[in-house]
Protein backbone atom coordinates (compact mmCIF):
# COMPACT_ATOMS: atom_id res chain seq x y z
CA UNK A 1 0.00 0.00 0.00
CA UNK A 2 2.82 2.40 0.88
CA UNK A 3 4.59 1.57 -2.39
CA UNK A 4 1.41 2.30 -4.36
CA UNK A 5 0.97 5.66 -2.61
CA UNK A 6 4.61 6.53 -3.25
CA UNK A 7 4.35 5.60 -6.95
CA UNK A 8 1.11 7.59 -7.25
CA UNK A 9 2.79 10.60 -5.71
CA UNK A 10 5.91 10.34 -7.88
CA UNK A 11 4.48 9.19 -11.22
CA UNK A 12 0.79 9.99 -11.08
CA UNK A 13 -2.07 7.55 -11.64
CA UNK A 14 -1.50 7.42 -15.40
CA UNK A 15 1.81 5.62 -14.98
CA UNK A 16 0.17 2.77 -13.11
CA UNK A 17 -2.62 2.43 -15.66
CA UNK A 18 -0.34 2.09 -18.67
CA UNK A 19 0.04 -1.33 -20.22
CA UNK A 20 2.93 -2.64 -22.22
CA UNK A 21 3.66 -0.34 -25.13
CA UNK A 22 3.22 -1.97 -28.52
CA UNK A 23 4.81 -0.54 -31.63
CA UNK A 24 2.17 0.79 -34.03
CA UNK A 25 1.43 -1.35 -37.05
CA UNK A 26 3.12 0.18 -40.09
CA UNK A 27 0.80 1.26 -42.89
CA UNK A 28 0.60 -1.12 -45.85
CA UNK A 29 3.35 -0.61 -48.41
CA UNK A 30 2.41 1.57 -51.35
CA UNK A 31 1.96 -0.32 -54.58
CA UNK A 32 4.80 -0.06 -57.07
CA UNK A 33 2.81 1.84 -59.73
CA UNK A 34 1.84 4.59 -57.29
CA UNK A 35 5.46 4.93 -56.15
CA UNK A 36 6.77 4.95 -59.73
CA UNK A 37 4.24 7.50 -61.01
CA UNK A 38 4.89 9.74 -58.02
CA UNK A 39 8.67 9.48 -58.43
CA UNK A 40 8.56 10.71 -62.06
CA UNK A 41 6.41 13.74 -61.21
CA UNK A 42 2.84 12.63 -61.87
CA UNK A 43 0.55 14.54 -59.50
CA UNK A 44 -2.83 15.36 -61.06
CA UNK A 45 -3.81 11.82 -61.98
CA UNK A 46 -2.00 10.20 -59.05
CA UNK A 47 -5.13 9.76 -56.87
CA UNK A 48 -6.92 7.86 -59.67
CA UNK A 49 -3.82 5.83 -60.53
CA UNK A 50 -3.28 4.98 -56.86
CA UNK A 51 -6.90 3.93 -56.29
CA UNK A 52 -7.00 1.67 -59.35
CA UNK A 53 -3.53 0.26 -58.76
CA UNK A 54 -4.31 -0.50 -55.13
CA UNK A 55 -7.40 -2.46 -56.16
CA UNK A 56 -5.47 -4.19 -58.94
CA UNK A 57 -2.63 -5.52 -56.78
CA UNK A 58 -4.82 -6.51 -53.83
CA UNK A 59 -4.29 -10.18 -53.03
CA UNK A 60 -1.25 -10.60 -55.28
CA UNK A 61 1.87 -12.25 -53.84
CA UNK A 62 4.05 -9.86 -55.78
CA UNK A 63 3.85 -7.39 -58.62
CA UNK A 64 6.03 -5.20 -60.81
CA UNK A 65 5.36 -2.44 -63.31
CA UNK A 66 6.46 -1.12 -66.67
CA UNK A 67 5.83 2.64 -66.87
CA UNK A 68 5.85 5.10 -69.76
CA UNK A 69 5.15 8.82 -69.41
CA UNK A 70 5.80 12.21 -71.02
CA UNK A 71 9.28 12.97 -69.74
CA UNK A 72 9.06 16.67 -70.67
CA UNK A 73 5.72 17.23 -68.94
CA UNK A 74 5.12 14.32 -66.56
CA UNK A 75 2.13 15.94 -64.86
CA UNK A 76 0.48 17.14 -68.08
CA UNK A 77 0.99 14.11 -70.33
CA UNK A 78 -0.44 10.60 -70.44
CA UNK A 79 0.85 7.82 -68.19
CA UNK A 80 0.83 4.25 -69.48
CA UNK A 81 1.50 1.24 -67.26
CA UNK A 82 1.61 -2.52 -67.58
CA UNK A 83 1.49 -4.37 -64.27
CA UNK A 84 2.57 -7.99 -63.87
CA UNK A 85 0.88 -9.77 -60.96
CA UNK A 86 1.82 -13.06 -59.35
CA UNK A 87 -0.86 -15.02 -57.51
CA UNK A 88 -0.52 -18.39 -55.79
CA UNK A 89 -1.88 -20.28 -58.78
CA UNK A 90 -1.83 -17.79 -61.67
CA UNK A 91 -0.17 -14.88 -63.37
CA UNK A 92 -2.14 -11.85 -64.50
CA UNK A 93 -1.36 -8.62 -66.34
CA UNK A 94 -3.12 -5.31 -65.91
CA UNK A 95 -2.92 -2.05 -67.77
CA UNK A 96 -3.72 1.36 -66.27
CA UNK A 97 -3.62 4.49 -68.44
CA UNK A 98 -4.28 8.02 -67.18
CA UNK A 99 -4.59 11.13 -69.34
CA UNK A 100 -4.88 14.56 -67.70
CA UNK A 101 -7.65 16.81 -68.98
CA UNK A 102 -8.05 20.56 -68.80
CA UNK A 103 -9.66 21.66 -65.57
CA UNK A 104 -7.75 19.13 -63.46
CA UNK A 105 -9.74 15.99 -64.30
CA UNK A 106 -8.23 12.75 -65.61
CA UNK A 107 -9.48 10.17 -68.07
CA UNK A 108 -8.47 6.75 -66.80
CA UNK A 109 -8.62 3.33 -68.42
CA UNK A 110 -7.91 0.03 -66.69
CA UNK A 111 -7.81 -3.52 -68.00
CA UNK A 112 -7.07 -6.85 -66.39
CA UNK A 113 -5.65 -9.54 -68.66
CA UNK A 114 -5.69 -13.21 -67.67
CA UNK A 115 -5.98 -16.71 -69.09
CA UNK A 116 -8.83 -18.92 -67.94
CA UNK A 117 -8.61 -22.73 -68.25
CA UNK A 118 -12.09 -22.81 -69.80
CA UNK A 119 -13.53 -22.18 -73.23
CA UNK A 120 -14.59 -18.63 -73.98
CA UNK A 121 -18.11 -19.88 -74.72
CA UNK A 122 -18.42 -21.37 -71.22
CA UNK A 123 -17.17 -18.14 -69.61
CA UNK A 124 -19.69 -16.11 -71.60
CA UNK A 125 -22.53 -18.49 -70.64
CA UNK A 126 -21.70 -18.39 -66.93
CA UNK A 127 -20.43 -14.84 -66.32
CA UNK A 128 -21.78 -12.63 -69.10
CA UNK A 129 -25.51 -13.38 -69.15
CA UNK A 130 -27.36 -10.26 -70.34
CA UNK A 131 -24.29 -8.77 -72.04
CA UNK A 132 -24.38 -7.88 -75.73
CA UNK A 133 -21.79 -9.64 -77.87
CA UNK A 134 -19.92 -8.16 -80.83
CA UNK A 135 -17.77 -10.63 -82.75
CA UNK A 136 -14.63 -8.90 -84.04
CA UNK A 137 -13.01 -12.06 -85.40
CA UNK A 138 -14.05 -15.72 -85.32
CA UNK A 139 -11.89 -16.11 -82.18
CA UNK A 140 -12.43 -12.63 -80.64
CA UNK A 141 -15.68 -11.40 -79.04
CA UNK A 142 -16.36 -8.23 -77.06
CA UNK A 143 -19.18 -8.19 -74.50
CA UNK A 144 -20.83 -5.05 -73.12
CA UNK A 145 -23.39 -4.64 -70.37
CA UNK A 146 -26.08 -2.07 -71.24
CA UNK A 147 -26.05 -1.03 -67.56
CA UNK A 148 -22.31 -0.18 -67.78
CA UNK A 149 -21.75 1.24 -71.28
CA UNK A 150 -18.17 2.37 -70.54
CA UNK A 151 -17.03 -1.13 -69.62
CA UNK A 152 -16.40 -4.25 -71.69
CA UNK A 153 -15.11 -7.81 -71.45
CA UNK A 154 -13.13 -9.26 -74.36
CA UNK A 155 -12.78 -13.02 -74.80
CA UNK A 156 -10.18 -14.43 -77.19
CA UNK A 157 -10.15 -18.15 -77.90
CA UNK A 158 -6.70 -19.49 -77.05
CA UNK A 159 -7.10 -23.27 -76.81
CA UNK A 160 -7.08 -24.97 -74.45
CA UNK A 161 -8.19 -21.81 -72.61
CA UNK A 162 -9.49 -18.31 -73.08
CA UNK A 163 -7.68 -14.96 -72.90
CA UNK A 164 -9.88 -12.63 -70.84
CA UNK A 165 -9.51 -8.84 -70.93
CA UNK A 166 -11.72 -6.95 -68.49
Language model: regions and residue ranges:
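Bacterial N-terminal signal peptides
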Residues: 2-12
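Boundary at the C-terminal end of the N-terminal hydrophobic targeting segment
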Residues: 14-19
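Long, charged/polar, surface-exposed segments that mediate recognition or autoinhibition
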Residues: 90-139
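Short, flexible domain-boundary/linker segments around small modular repeats
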Residues: 136, 141-148
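Short, surface-exposed beta-strand/loop micro-motifs that present aromatic residues
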Residues: 95-99, 151-156
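Short, structured motif recognition centered on aromatic/hydrophobic residues
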Residues: 42-49, 108-110, 120, 160-166
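Short, exposed beta-strand-loop hairpins at the edges of beta-sheets
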Residues: 143, 152-161, 165-166
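N-terminal secretory signal peptides
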Residues: 20-101
Amino acid sequence: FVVTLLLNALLGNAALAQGVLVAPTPPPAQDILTRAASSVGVKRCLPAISRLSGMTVQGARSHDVLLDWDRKQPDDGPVFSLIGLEYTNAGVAASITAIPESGGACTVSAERISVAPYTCASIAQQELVGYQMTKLLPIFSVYTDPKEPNSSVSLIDSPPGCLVIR
